[in-house]
Amino acid sequence: MAKQIKFSDDARKSMVEGINKLSDTVKVTLGPKGRNVVLDKEYGAPLITNDGVSIAREIELEDEYENMGAQLVKEVATKTNDVAGDGTTTATLLAQAIIREGLKNLAAGANPIVLQKGIKKAVEKSVEAIKARSHSVTTKEEIANVGSVSAADETIGKLIAEAMEKVGNNGVITVEESKSMGTTLNVVEGMEFDRGYVSPYMVSDSDKMVAAMEDPFILVTDRKITNIQDILPLLEQVVQQGKPLFIIAEDVEGEALATLVLNKIRGTFNCVAVKAPGFGDRRKEMLEDICILTGAQLITEDLGIELKDASFDMLGRARKVNVSKDKTTIVDGNGDQSKIEERINQIQNRIPETDSEYDREKLQERLAKLSGGVAVIEVGAATETELKERKLRIEDALAATRAAVEEGIVAGGGTILLDIIEEVEKLVDDVEGDEKTGVKIILKALEEPVKQIAINAGIDGSVIVENVKNKDKGIGFDAYKGEYVDMLKAGIVDPTKVTLSALQNAASVASLLLTTEAAVVTIKKDEPAMPQPGPGAYM
Protein backbone atom coordinates (compact mmCIF):
# COMPACT_ATOMS: atom_id res chain seq x y z
CA MET A 1 0.00 0.00 0.00
CA ALA A 2 1.30 3.46 -0.94
CA LYS A 3 2.02 5.87 1.93
CA GLN A 4 1.76 9.63 2.27
CA ILE A 5 4.29 11.48 4.43
CA LYS A 6 4.14 14.93 6.03
CA PHE A 7 7.05 16.57 7.85
CA SER A 8 7.64 18.89 10.86
CA ASP A 9 5.09 21.76 11.20
CA ASP A 10 2.93 20.41 8.40
CA ALA A 11 2.63 17.00 10.15
CA ARG A 12 2.03 18.47 13.61
CA LYS A 13 -0.57 21.02 12.44
CA SER A 14 -2.65 18.30 10.76
CA MET A 15 -2.56 16.13 13.90
CA VAL A 16 -3.37 19.10 16.15
CA GLU A 17 -6.55 19.71 14.15
CA GLY A 18 -7.72 16.23 15.21
CA ILE A 19 -6.55 16.74 18.80
CA ASN A 20 -8.57 19.96 19.05
CA LYS A 21 -11.69 18.39 17.54
CA LEU A 22 -11.64 15.57 20.11
CA SER A 23 -10.61 17.73 23.09
CA ASP A 24 -13.15 20.47 22.33
CA THR A 25 -15.89 17.83 22.21
CA VAL A 26 -14.85 16.29 25.53
CA LYS A 27 -14.04 19.42 27.56
CA VAL A 28 -17.60 20.83 27.45
CA THR A 29 -18.52 18.10 29.98
CA LEU A 30 -16.11 19.28 32.73
CA GLY A 31 -17.35 20.54 36.07
CA PRO A 32 -20.70 20.73 37.88
CA LYS A 33 -22.20 22.85 35.09
CA GLY A 34 -20.64 20.84 32.26
CA ARG A 35 -22.89 19.87 29.35
CA ASN A 36 -23.68 16.47 27.84
CA VAL A 37 -22.66 15.08 24.45
CA VAL A 38 -25.00 12.99 22.27
CA LEU A 39 -23.37 9.95 20.65
CA ASP A 40 -24.98 8.33 17.64
CA LYS A 41 -25.24 4.55 17.91
CA GLU A 42 -25.46 2.16 14.97
CA TYR A 43 -28.23 0.27 16.75
CA GLY A 44 -30.75 1.58 19.24
CA ALA A 45 -31.20 5.03 20.76
CA PRO A 46 -28.37 7.61 20.87
CA LEU A 47 -26.30 7.71 24.07
CA ILE A 48 -26.30 10.98 26.02
CA THR A 49 -23.29 11.18 28.34
CA ASN A 50 -20.74 13.42 30.04
CA ASP A 51 -18.19 10.61 30.43
CA GLY A 52 -14.95 11.72 28.76
CA VAL A 53 -13.65 8.30 27.76
CA SER A 54 -17.00 7.17 26.31
CA ILE A 55 -17.05 10.28 24.10
CA ALA A 56 -13.38 9.91 23.09
CA ARG A 57 -13.86 6.26 22.11
CA GLU A 58 -16.62 7.20 19.65
CA ILE A 59 -14.55 9.75 17.72
CA GLU A 60 -13.08 8.65 14.38
CA LEU A 61 -12.14 11.41 11.91
CA GLU A 62 -12.16 11.22 8.12
CA ASP A 63 -8.80 12.91 7.55
CA GLU A 64 -6.04 10.35 8.36
CA TYR A 65 -3.65 12.89 9.92
CA GLU A 66 -6.37 14.47 12.05
CA ASN A 67 -7.51 11.01 13.09
CA MET A 68 -3.94 10.11 14.10
CA GLY A 69 -3.90 13.11 16.47
CA ALA A 70 -7.33 12.26 17.85
CA GLN A 71 -6.24 8.66 18.50
CA LEU A 72 -3.21 9.89 20.48
CA VAL A 73 -5.41 11.94 22.82
CA LYS A 74 -7.89 9.06 22.98
CA GLU A 75 -4.98 7.02 24.36
CA VAL A 76 -4.60 9.61 27.18
CA ALA A 77 -8.28 9.23 28.12
CA THR A 78 -8.25 5.43 27.86
CA LYS A 79 -5.04 5.01 29.89
CA THR A 80 -6.34 7.35 32.63
CA ASN A 81 -9.63 5.45 32.70
CA ASP A 82 -7.80 2.09 32.96
CA VAL A 83 -5.59 3.26 35.84
CA ALA A 84 -7.97 5.46 37.84
CA GLY A 85 -11.44 4.91 36.34
CA ASP A 86 -12.15 8.65 36.18
CA GLY A 87 -10.49 11.98 35.31
CA THR A 88 -10.54 11.33 31.57
CA THR A 89 -11.88 14.79 30.67
CA THR A 90 -9.18 16.48 32.77
CA ALA A 91 -6.49 14.32 31.14
CA THR A 92 -7.72 15.23 27.63
CA LEU A 93 -7.85 18.94 28.52
CA LEU A 94 -4.32 18.91 29.98
CA ALA A 95 -2.93 17.10 26.92
CA GLN A 96 -4.50 19.70 24.61
CA ALA A 97 -3.08 22.57 26.69
CA ILE A 98 0.47 21.12 26.78
CA ILE A 99 0.41 20.47 23.02
CA ARG A 100 -0.97 23.96 22.24
CA GLU A 101 1.67 25.76 24.34
CA GLY A 102 4.41 23.42 23.12
CA LEU A 103 3.65 24.04 19.43
CA LYS A 104 3.82 27.81 19.95
CA ASN A 105 7.34 27.40 21.28
CA LEU A 106 8.38 24.97 18.54
CA ALA A 107 7.26 27.55 15.97
CA ALA A 108 9.48 30.08 17.77
CA GLY A 109 12.46 27.74 17.31
CA ALA A 110 12.58 25.74 20.58
CA ASN A 111 14.31 22.34 20.59
CA PRO A 112 11.59 19.67 21.13
CA ILE A 113 13.91 17.22 22.95
CA VAL A 114 15.06 19.84 25.48
CA LEU A 115 11.47 21.05 25.79
CA GLN A 116 10.38 17.47 26.60
CA LYS A 117 13.05 17.32 29.32
CA GLY A 118 11.64 20.45 30.98
CA ILE A 119 8.08 19.10 30.76
CA LYS A 120 9.19 15.86 32.41
CA LYS A 121 10.93 17.68 35.29
CA ALA A 122 7.89 19.90 35.90
CA VAL A 123 5.53 16.91 35.95
CA GLU A 124 7.77 15.05 38.43
CA LYS A 125 7.78 18.12 40.68
CA SER A 126 3.98 18.44 40.33
CA VAL A 127 3.43 14.78 41.28
CA GLU A 128 5.62 15.23 44.35
CA ALA A 129 3.70 18.37 45.39
CA ILE A 130 0.26 16.77 44.85
CA LYS A 131 1.23 13.71 46.92
CA ALA A 132 2.41 15.99 49.75
CA ARG A 133 -1.03 17.65 49.85
CA SER A 134 -3.01 14.41 49.73
CA HIS A 135 -5.35 13.54 52.63
CA SER A 136 -6.41 9.99 53.44
CA VAL A 137 -10.11 9.11 53.29
CA THR A 138 -11.45 7.72 56.54
CA THR A 139 -15.08 8.68 57.10
CA LYS A 140 -18.26 7.66 55.31
CA GLU A 141 -18.94 11.36 54.63
CA GLU A 142 -15.59 11.79 52.82
CA ILE A 143 -16.27 8.71 50.68
CA ALA A 144 -19.72 10.12 49.82
CA ASN A 145 -18.17 13.47 48.84
CA VAL A 146 -15.87 11.84 46.27
CA GLY A 147 -18.74 9.95 44.65
CA SER A 148 -20.98 13.04 44.70
CA VAL A 149 -18.40 15.23 42.94
CA SER A 150 -17.59 12.58 40.32
CA ALA A 151 -21.24 11.87 39.48
CA ALA A 152 -22.43 15.46 40.09
CA ASP A 153 -25.18 13.88 42.20
CA GLU A 154 -25.27 13.76 46.00
CA THR A 155 -27.56 10.71 46.19
CA ILE A 156 -25.13 8.64 44.11
CA GLY A 157 -22.26 9.55 46.45
CA LYS A 158 -24.29 8.51 49.50
CA LEU A 159 -25.31 5.25 47.83
CA ILE A 160 -21.66 4.33 47.07
CA ALA A 161 -20.56 5.25 50.61
CA GLU A 162 -23.32 3.03 52.01
CA ALA A 163 -22.27 0.16 49.72
CA MET A 164 -18.64 0.47 50.85
CA GLU A 165 -19.69 0.60 54.50
CA LYS A 166 -21.61 -2.66 54.10
CA VAL A 167 -19.13 -4.73 52.07
CA GLY A 168 -15.85 -3.05 53.05
CA ASN A 169 -13.57 -0.89 50.91
CA ASN A 170 -12.25 -3.94 49.06
CA GLY A 171 -15.65 -5.59 48.75
CA VAL A 172 -17.32 -6.39 45.44
CA ILE A 173 -19.71 -3.65 44.26
CA THR A 174 -21.55 -4.14 40.97
CA VAL A 175 -23.73 -1.71 39.01
CA GLU A 176 -26.75 -3.23 37.28
CA GLU A 177 -29.83 -2.00 35.44
CA SER A 178 -33.04 -1.96 37.47
CA LYS A 179 -36.51 -2.71 36.17
CA SER A 180 -37.97 0.06 38.35
CA MET A 181 -37.59 3.86 38.13
CA GLY A 182 -35.54 4.31 41.31
CA THR A 183 -31.88 3.58 42.07
CA THR A 184 -31.43 1.20 45.00
CA LEU A 185 -28.72 -0.67 46.89
CA ASN A 186 -28.97 -4.40 47.63
CA VAL A 187 -26.34 -6.31 49.59
CA VAL A 188 -26.10 -10.08 49.22
CA GLU A 189 -23.63 -12.52 50.69
CA GLY A 190 -21.59 -13.87 47.81
CA MET A 191 -18.33 -14.29 45.96
CA GLU A 192 -17.25 -13.00 42.56
CA PHE A 193 -14.33 -14.14 40.39
CA ASP A 194 -13.07 -13.37 36.88
CA ARG A 195 -14.04 -16.46 34.93
CA GLY A 196 -16.93 -16.86 32.49
CA TYR A 197 -18.78 -19.79 30.93
CA VAL A 198 -16.71 -22.21 28.80
CA SER A 199 -19.37 -22.15 26.06
CA PRO A 200 -21.80 -19.37 25.05
CA TYR A 201 -24.43 -22.08 24.46
CA MET A 202 -24.76 -22.30 28.25
CA VAL A 203 -26.45 -18.89 28.59
CA SER A 204 -30.02 -18.60 29.83
CA ASP A 205 -30.52 -14.99 28.66
CA SER A 206 -29.29 -14.55 25.08
CA ASP A 207 -29.88 -10.75 25.10
CA LYS A 208 -27.58 -10.10 28.05
CA MET A 209 -25.47 -13.21 27.36
CA VAL A 210 -25.61 -14.38 30.98
CA ALA A 211 -26.34 -17.75 32.58
CA ALA A 212 -28.44 -17.47 35.75
CA MET A 213 -29.10 -20.48 37.99
CA GLU A 214 -31.41 -20.69 40.98
CA ASP A 215 -30.50 -23.09 43.80
CA PRO A 216 -27.87 -25.08 41.85
CA PHE A 217 -25.66 -27.97 43.00
CA ILE A 218 -21.97 -27.06 42.72
CA LEU A 219 -19.13 -29.37 41.67
CA VAL A 220 -15.61 -28.07 42.42
CA THR A 221 -12.50 -29.82 41.06
CA ASP A 222 -8.95 -28.90 40.05
CA ARG A 223 -8.99 -31.56 37.30
CA LYS A 224 -9.77 -31.24 33.60
CA ILE A 225 -13.09 -32.84 32.59
CA THR A 226 -12.91 -34.42 29.12
CA ASN A 227 -14.80 -37.69 29.59
CA ILE A 228 -18.53 -37.42 30.37
CA GLN A 229 -18.43 -40.87 32.03
CA ASP A 230 -16.40 -39.35 34.91
CA ILE A 231 -19.30 -37.16 36.01
CA LEU A 232 -22.26 -39.17 34.67
CA PRO A 233 -23.28 -40.69 38.07
CA LEU A 234 -23.33 -37.20 39.63
CA LEU A 235 -25.23 -35.75 36.68
CA GLU A 236 -27.94 -38.41 36.95
CA GLN A 237 -28.44 -37.70 40.65
CA VAL A 238 -28.64 -33.92 40.05
CA VAL A 239 -31.18 -34.41 37.22
CA GLN A 240 -33.33 -36.54 39.58
CA GLN A 241 -33.37 -33.59 42.01
CA GLY A 242 -34.61 -31.30 39.20
CA LYS A 243 -31.89 -28.72 39.95
CA PRO A 244 -29.20 -27.13 37.74
CA LEU A 245 -25.52 -28.10 38.06
CA PHE A 246 -22.69 -25.56 38.24
CA ILE A 247 -19.20 -26.94 37.50
CA ILE A 248 -15.90 -25.26 38.41
CA ALA A 249 -12.98 -27.22 36.91
CA GLU A 250 -9.53 -26.66 35.41
CA ASP A 251 -11.28 -26.98 32.06
CA VAL A 252 -14.24 -28.73 30.43
CA GLU A 253 -13.63 -29.85 26.85
CA GLY A 254 -14.08 -32.54 24.23
CA GLU A 255 -16.84 -35.10 24.65
CA ALA A 256 -17.81 -33.83 28.12
CA LEU A 257 -18.40 -30.26 26.89
CA ALA A 258 -20.28 -31.42 23.79
CA THR A 259 -22.61 -33.62 25.88
CA LEU A 260 -23.33 -30.87 28.43
CA VAL A 261 -24.06 -28.28 25.72
CA LEU A 262 -26.25 -30.67 23.72
CA ASN A 263 -28.35 -31.55 26.76
CA LYS A 264 -28.63 -27.87 27.71
CA ILE A 265 -29.92 -26.99 24.20
CA ARG A 266 -32.38 -29.91 24.26
CA GLY A 267 -33.57 -28.84 27.70
CA THR A 268 -32.73 -32.21 29.31
CA PHE A 269 -30.90 -30.47 32.15
CA ASN A 270 -29.35 -27.09 32.96
CA CYS A 271 -25.58 -27.13 33.41
CA VAL A 272 -23.05 -24.28 33.34
CA ALA A 273 -19.28 -24.80 33.57
CA VAL A 274 -16.48 -22.28 34.22
CA LYS A 275 -12.71 -22.59 34.45
CA ALA A 276 -11.20 -22.42 37.92
CA PRO A 277 -10.00 -18.93 38.95
CA GLY A 278 -6.35 -18.08 39.67
CA PHE A 279 -3.13 -19.89 38.78
CA GLY A 280 -0.82 -22.42 40.43
CA ASP A 281 -0.99 -22.62 44.23
CA ARG A 282 -3.29 -19.60 44.34
CA ARG A 283 -5.85 -21.47 42.23
CA LYS A 284 -6.06 -24.29 44.76
CA GLU A 285 -6.53 -21.83 47.63
CA MET A 286 -9.30 -20.01 45.76
CA LEU A 287 -11.05 -23.31 45.03
CA GLU A 288 -10.86 -24.17 48.73
CA ASP A 289 -12.43 -20.75 49.51
CA ILE A 290 -15.30 -21.54 47.13
CA CYS A 291 -15.75 -24.97 48.74
CA ILE A 292 -15.94 -23.47 52.24
CA LEU A 293 -18.42 -20.84 51.04
CA THR A 294 -20.71 -23.36 49.30
CA GLY A 295 -20.23 -26.41 51.52
CA ALA A 296 -18.63 -28.42 48.69
CA GLN A 297 -15.73 -30.89 48.92
CA LEU A 298 -12.77 -30.11 46.64
CA ILE A 299 -12.34 -33.08 44.29
CA THR A 300 -8.60 -33.37 43.81
CA GLU A 301 -6.18 -36.24 43.38
CA ASP A 302 -4.00 -34.58 46.05
CA LEU A 303 -6.59 -35.86 48.56
CA GLY A 304 -6.87 -39.20 46.76
CA ILE A 305 -10.30 -38.35 45.30
CA GLU A 306 -10.82 -38.94 41.59
CA LEU A 307 -13.69 -37.47 39.61
CA LYS A 308 -15.28 -40.83 38.88
CA ASP A 309 -15.28 -41.63 42.62
CA ALA A 310 -16.97 -38.34 43.62
CA SER A 311 -20.22 -38.77 45.53
CA PHE A 312 -23.37 -36.64 45.60
CA ASP A 313 -22.67 -35.35 49.13
CA MET A 314 -19.44 -33.73 47.87
CA LEU A 315 -21.48 -31.16 45.92
CA GLY A 316 -22.02 -27.68 47.35
CA ARG A 317 -25.11 -25.47 47.12
CA ALA A 318 -25.89 -21.77 46.66
CA ARG A 319 -29.10 -19.77 46.39
CA LYS A 320 -28.05 -18.24 43.08
CA VAL A 321 -25.17 -18.30 40.59
CA ASN A 322 -24.80 -15.72 37.79
CA VAL A 323 -22.23 -16.28 35.02
CA SER A 324 -21.34 -13.82 32.23
CA LYS A 325 -18.69 -14.25 29.53
CA ASP A 326 -15.94 -13.11 31.93
CA LYS A 327 -17.38 -13.07 35.46
CA THR A 328 -19.04 -15.45 37.94
CA THR A 329 -20.97 -14.45 41.07
CA ILE A 330 -21.99 -17.02 43.69
CA VAL A 331 -24.70 -15.64 45.97
CA ASP A 332 -25.65 -16.98 49.39
CA GLY A 333 -23.50 -20.14 49.53
CA ASN A 334 -24.56 -23.03 51.74
CA GLY A 335 -21.27 -23.26 53.68
CA ASP A 336 -20.86 -23.67 57.43
CA GLN A 337 -20.55 -20.17 58.98
CA SER A 338 -18.01 -21.30 61.59
CA LYS A 339 -15.75 -22.72 58.85
CA ILE A 340 -16.07 -19.50 56.84
CA GLU A 341 -15.03 -17.45 59.90
CA GLU A 342 -12.12 -19.83 60.54
CA ARG A 343 -10.96 -19.38 56.94
CA ILE A 344 -11.25 -15.57 57.23
CA ASN A 345 -9.07 -15.64 60.37
CA GLN A 346 -6.46 -17.79 58.59
CA ILE A 347 -6.21 -15.29 55.72
CA GLN A 348 -6.12 -12.29 58.11
CA ASN A 349 -3.20 -13.87 59.98
CA ARG A 350 -1.27 -14.44 56.73
CA ILE A 351 -1.52 -10.83 55.50
CA PRO A 352 1.04 -9.28 57.97
CA GLU A 353 3.48 -12.17 57.35
CA THR A 354 3.61 -11.61 53.57
CA ASP A 355 6.54 -9.63 52.14
CA SER A 356 5.23 -9.46 48.58
CA GLU A 357 2.88 -6.54 47.85
CA TYR A 358 1.22 -8.61 45.11
CA ASP A 359 0.58 -11.56 47.45
CA ARG A 360 -0.80 -9.21 50.11
CA GLU A 361 -3.15 -7.68 47.55
CA LYS A 362 -4.40 -11.11 46.48
CA LEU A 363 -4.96 -12.18 50.11
CA GLN A 364 -6.98 -9.01 50.75
CA GLU A 365 -9.00 -9.75 47.62
CA ARG A 366 -9.79 -13.26 48.90
CA LEU A 367 -10.67 -11.85 52.31
CA ALA A 368 -13.09 -9.34 50.79
CA LYS A 369 -14.76 -12.05 48.72
CA LEU A 370 -15.20 -14.32 51.75
CA SER A 371 -16.29 -11.70 54.27
CA GLY A 372 -17.73 -8.75 52.38
CA GLY A 373 -20.39 -10.18 50.16
CA VAL A 374 -21.61 -8.45 47.02
CA ALA A 375 -23.26 -5.02 46.94
CA VAL A 376 -25.45 -4.42 43.90
CA ILE A 377 -26.39 -0.85 42.93
CA GLU A 378 -29.49 -1.20 40.76
CA VAL A 379 -29.88 1.82 38.50
CA GLY A 380 -33.35 2.93 37.46
CA ALA A 381 -34.58 5.70 35.13
CA ALA A 382 -37.60 6.74 33.07
CA THR A 383 -36.07 5.95 29.68
CA GLU A 384 -33.33 3.64 28.41
CA THR A 385 -31.25 6.63 27.25
CA GLU A 386 -31.33 8.18 30.73
CA LEU A 387 -30.62 4.80 32.32
CA LYS A 388 -27.43 4.29 30.26
CA GLU A 389 -26.22 7.82 31.07
CA ARG A 390 -26.91 7.37 34.78
CA LYS A 391 -25.25 3.96 34.86
CA LEU A 392 -22.07 5.38 33.26
CA ARG A 393 -21.96 8.17 35.86
CA ILE A 394 -22.34 5.71 38.74
CA GLU A 395 -19.59 3.45 37.33
CA ASP A 396 -17.25 6.47 37.07
CA ALA A 397 -18.13 7.61 40.59
CA LEU A 398 -17.49 4.12 41.96
CA ALA A 399 -14.06 4.00 40.29
CA ALA A 400 -13.22 7.48 41.64
CA THR A 401 -14.28 6.48 45.16
CA ARG A 402 -12.13 3.33 45.07
CA ALA A 403 -9.17 5.45 43.88
CA ALA A 404 -9.76 7.90 46.76
CA VAL A 405 -9.83 5.13 49.37
CA GLU A 406 -6.64 3.70 47.86
CA GLU A 407 -4.47 6.85 47.59
CA GLY A 408 -6.36 9.68 49.31
CA ILE A 409 -7.99 12.93 48.18
CA VAL A 410 -6.96 16.48 47.25
CA ALA A 411 -8.85 19.78 46.84
CA GLY A 412 -11.19 19.35 43.87
CA GLY A 413 -12.33 21.50 40.98
CA GLY A 414 -8.76 21.79 39.66
CA THR A 415 -7.77 23.77 42.80
CA ILE A 416 -4.90 21.42 43.68
CA LEU A 417 -3.25 22.14 40.31
CA LEU A 418 -3.24 25.89 41.04
CA ASP A 419 -2.05 25.29 44.62
CA ILE A 420 1.13 23.55 43.44
CA ILE A 421 2.10 26.20 40.85
CA GLU A 422 4.21 28.06 43.44
CA GLU A 423 6.32 24.96 44.13
CA VAL A 424 6.74 24.04 40.46
CA GLU A 425 7.79 27.66 39.71
CA LYS A 426 10.90 27.10 41.86
CA LEU A 427 12.20 24.88 39.05
CA VAL A 428 12.33 27.87 36.69
CA ASP A 429 15.44 29.22 38.46
CA ASP A 430 17.17 25.80 38.38
CA VAL A 431 16.91 25.24 34.61
CA GLU A 432 17.61 27.37 31.56
CA GLY A 433 16.89 27.75 27.86
CA ASP A 434 14.27 25.49 26.31
CA GLU A 435 14.16 23.37 29.47
CA LYS A 436 12.85 26.44 31.32
CA THR A 437 10.26 26.86 28.55
CA GLY A 438 9.17 23.23 29.10
CA VAL A 439 8.56 23.97 32.80
CA LYS A 440 6.54 27.08 31.88
CA ILE A 441 4.38 25.00 29.50
CA ILE A 442 3.30 22.81 32.44
CA LEU A 443 2.73 25.87 34.65
CA LYS A 444 0.37 27.24 32.00
CA ALA A 445 -1.38 23.86 31.53
CA LEU A 446 -2.04 23.54 35.29
CA GLU A 447 -4.44 26.50 35.02
CA GLU A 448 -6.62 24.85 32.36
CA PRO A 449 -9.02 22.70 34.47
CA VAL A 450 -10.12 25.63 36.71
CA LYS A 451 -10.42 27.88 33.66
CA GLN A 452 -12.55 25.34 31.73
CA ILE A 453 -14.82 24.59 34.72
CA ALA A 454 -15.51 28.35 34.98
CA ILE A 455 -16.09 28.69 31.22
CA ASN A 456 -18.58 25.80 31.32
CA ALA A 457 -20.39 27.67 34.12
CA GLY A 458 -20.61 30.77 31.89
CA ILE A 459 -17.90 32.78 33.73
CA ASP A 460 -14.60 34.29 32.54
CA GLY A 461 -12.08 31.53 33.27
CA SER A 462 -8.94 33.73 33.36
CA VAL A 463 -10.42 35.95 36.10
CA ILE A 464 -11.32 32.92 38.24
CA VAL A 465 -7.80 31.45 37.83
CA GLU A 466 -6.17 34.70 39.02
CA ASN A 467 -8.58 35.01 41.96
CA VAL A 468 -7.93 31.42 43.14
CA LYS A 469 -4.15 31.91 42.79
CA ASN A 470 -4.32 34.95 45.07
CA LYS A 471 -6.28 33.15 47.78
CA ASP A 472 -5.01 30.79 50.50
CA LYS A 473 -4.11 27.23 49.54
CA GLY A 474 -7.13 24.95 49.45
CA ILE A 475 -9.55 27.78 48.63
CA GLY A 476 -11.12 27.17 45.24
CA PHE A 477 -14.05 28.16 43.08
CA ASP A 478 -17.32 26.29 43.59
CA ALA A 479 -18.74 26.64 40.07
CA TYR A 480 -22.12 25.27 41.12
CA LYS A 481 -22.77 27.98 43.73
CA GLY A 482 -20.55 30.60 42.09
CA GLU A 483 -18.49 31.30 45.24
CA TYR A 484 -15.00 30.75 46.69
CA VAL A 485 -14.86 28.06 49.39
CA ASP A 486 -12.45 25.81 51.28
CA MET A 487 -12.75 22.86 48.89
CA LEU A 488 -11.97 20.09 51.41
CA LYS A 489 -14.42 21.46 53.99
CA ALA A 490 -17.09 21.94 51.32
CA GLY A 491 -16.63 18.31 50.25
CA ILE A 492 -15.44 19.27 46.74
CA VAL A 493 -12.61 16.76 46.40
CA ASP A 494 -10.83 14.70 43.75
CA PRO A 495 -9.02 11.39 44.27
CA THR A 496 -5.23 11.87 44.31
CA LYS A 497 -4.80 8.89 41.98
CA VAL A 498 -7.15 10.40 39.38
CA THR A 499 -5.37 13.78 39.41
CA LEU A 500 -1.91 12.18 39.15
CA SER A 501 -2.93 9.79 36.35
CA ALA A 502 -4.52 12.61 34.34
CA LEU A 503 -1.42 14.81 34.55
CA GLN A 504 1.14 12.05 33.94
CA ASN A 505 -0.68 10.50 30.97
CA ALA A 506 -1.41 13.89 29.39
CA ALA A 507 2.23 14.99 29.65
CA SER A 508 3.51 11.64 28.37
CA VAL A 509 1.51 11.67 25.12
CA ALA A 510 1.78 15.45 24.61
CA SER A 511 5.57 15.52 24.91
CA LEU A 512 5.84 12.61 22.46
CA LEU A 513 3.75 14.48 19.92
CA LEU A 514 5.93 17.59 20.31
CA THR A 515 9.00 15.50 19.39
CA THR A 516 7.29 14.16 16.24
CA GLU A 517 9.02 15.23 13.02
CA ALA A 518 7.16 13.11 10.44
CA ALA A 519 3.76 11.45 10.08
CA VAL A 520 3.08 8.54 7.72
CA VAL A 521 -0.40 7.45 6.65
CA THR A 522 -1.74 4.95 4.14
CA ILE A 523 -3.23 6.45 0.99
CA LYS A 524 -6.79 5.22 0.65
CA LYS A 525 -7.69 3.97 -2.80
CA ASP A 526 -11.11 4.87 -4.14
CA GLU A 527 -12.89 1.58 -4.61
CA PRO A 528 -14.67 1.42 -8.00
CA ALA A 529 -18.44 1.26 -7.75
CA MET A 530 -20.08 -2.12 -8.34
CA PRO A 531 -21.09 -2.41 -12.02
CA GLN A 532 -24.84 -2.22 -12.61
CA PRO A 533 -26.33 -5.49 -13.92
CA GLY A 534 -27.49 -5.33 -17.54
CA PRO A 535 -31.04 -5.96 -18.69
CA GLY A 536 -32.17 -9.53 -18.15
CA ALA A 537 -29.38 -10.21 -15.60
CA TYR A 538 -31.79 -11.71 -13.05
CA MET A 539 -33.80 -13.77 -15.53
From Swiss-Prot:
It comes from the Bacteria. PROSITE patterns: CHAPERONINS_CPN60. One of its GO terms (molecular function) is ATP-dependent protein folding chaperone. The keyword Glycosyltransferase does not apply. It holds the Pfam family Cpn60_TCP1. It catalyses: ATP + H2O + a folded polypeptide = ADP + phosphate + an unfolded polypeptide. Gene3D superfamilies: GroEL, GroEL-like equatorial domain, TCP-1-like chaperonin intermediate domain. Its main location: cytoplasm. ATP binds at T29, L30, G31, P32, D86, G87, T88, T89, T90, G413, D494. Belongs to the chaperonin (HSP60) family. Forms a cylinder of 14 subunits composed of two heptameric rings stacked back-to-back. Interacts with the co-chaperonin GroES. Together with its co-chaperonin GroES, plays an essential role in assisting protein folding. The GroEL-GroES system forms a nano-cage that allows encapsulation of the non-native substrate proteins and provides a physical environment optimized to promote and accelerate protein folding. PANTHER family: 60 KDA HEAT SHOCK PROTEIN, MITOCHONDRIAL. This is Chaperonin GroEL. It comes from Finegoldia magna (strain ATCC 29328 / DSM 20472 / WAL 2508) (Peptostreptococcus magnus). The lineage of its organism: Bacteria, Bacillati, Bacillota, Tissierellia, Tissierellales. The gene is groEL.
